[in-house]
Swiss-Prot record:
GO terms for molecular function: structural constituent of ribosome. Belongs to the universal ribosomal protein uL30 family. This is Large ribosomal subunit protein uL30. The lineage of its organism: Bacteria, Fusobacteriati, Fusobacteriota, Fusobacteriia, Fusobacteriales. One of its GO terms (cellular component) is cytosolic large ribosomal subunit. Part of the 50S ribosomal subunit. InterPro entries: Ribo_uL30_ferredoxin-like_sf, Ribosomal_uL30_bac-type, Ribosomal_uL30_ferredoxin-like. Keywords: Ribonucleoprotein, Ribosomal protein. It comes from the Bacteria. GO terms for biological process: translation.
Amino acid sequence: MARLRIELVKSIIGRKPNHIATVKSLGLKKMHDVVEHNETPELKGKLAQVSYLLKVEEVQA
């Protein structure tokens, strides 16, 4: 399974409530926060929903 590094690059202020909840469920609280997660189908769905707010990179293990 691949690891993904996810960074919040745009503000969640003024976004749809379900998009804000999705970003928070990823563990991102404020701009330029970075988290790493294993790539799963559930994660890919979340990333697709809020892709316009994020920068996603694959991490080499």
